[in-house]
Swiss-Prot record:
GO cellular component terms, A-Z: plasma membrane; proton-transporting ATP synthase complex
Annotated InterPro entries: ATP_synth_b/b'su_bac/chlpt, ATP_synthase_B_chain
Role description: F(1)F(0) ATP synthase produces ATP from ADP in the presence of a proton or sodium gradient. F-type ATPases consist of two structural domains, F(1) containing the extramembraneous catalytic core and F(0) containing the membrane proton channel, linked together by a central stalk and a peripheral stalk. During catalysis, ATP synthesis in the catalytic domain of F(1) is coupled via a rotary mechanism of the central stalk subunits to proton translocation. Component of the F(0) channel, it forms part of the peripheral stalk, linking F(1) to F(0).
Protein name as catalogued: ATP synthase subunit b
Lineage summary: Bacteria, Pseudomonadati, Pseudomonadota, Alphaproteobacteria, Hyphomonadales
Membrane protein topology class: Single-pass membrane protein
CDD domains: ATP-synt_Fo_b (cd06503)
GO molecular function: proton-transporting ATP synthase activity, rotational mechanism; proton-transporting ATPase activity, rotational mechanism
Length: 189
């Protein structure tokens, strides 16, 4: 009933304006409510509205508006739900990004530790190789010294033997010379 009353009031306000637009109130001497044309138009409109109200036209219109309002309300609720889901998805994505950053940092740290370990191992291997090569070089030097000493001794022995043969051959007989040469060779060898 309240809605019907508000519609009637709206009709009363609009009717004089419509009549004035058509050229009513000639000279402005007459008030709109006392004009018979306006009054008849107003009665026709009120009658039409009452018949429409009895037939349920306003219920249909209001039902459609209520349906539209409920649909809009559902869409708003759905939009709010979608917004919450989007916020949750964003939070999840941010957490995953943070986890990925932490994992990347952990991988980088592990790679640095592995690189340090590999560097230390390479240094140890290099030091071991250098030590082995130094030992091999020292062994070669010792062998070379031993061989050189042996060659010098042989050369000295050969020279001493040759000198002794010369001296003995000049001073002794052949048998004594041969025996002395054998003794010298045995002693030097």
């Amino acid at each position: 009933m309240k809605k019907t009353t508000s519609l009637l009031i709206a009709a009363l306000a609009v009717a004089p304006l419509a009549h004035a637009a058509e050229g009513g109130f000639v000279g402005g001497l007459m008030y709109a409510a006392t004009d018979p044309v306006t009054f008849v138009a107003f009665l026709c409109m009120v009658t039409f509205l009452l018949i429409a109200a009895r037939m349920g036209a306003f219920k249909t219109i209001l039902g459609g508006l209520d349906t539209r309002a409920s649909n809009i309300r559902k869409e708003l609720e759905e939009a709010a739900s979608l917004r919450e889901q989007a916020a949750e998805a964003l939070a999840l994505a941010e957490r995953r990004a943070q986890d990925a950053d932490k994992e990347a940092e952990a991988i980088i740290d592990q790679a640095k530790r592995d690189a340090k370990a590999m560097l230390e191992e390479a240094r140890r291997d290099l030091a071991e190789k250098i030590s082995r090569r130094e030992a091999q070089a020292a062994a070669r030097i010792t062998r070379a010294e031993t061989e050189a000493t042996s060659e010098v001794r042989r050369a000295a022995a050969d020279a001493a033997t040759a000198a002794a043969r010369r001296i003995l051959s000049e001073q002794t007989s052949v048998d004594q010379f041969e025996a002395a040469a054998r003794d010298i060779e045995r002693a030097l060898s």
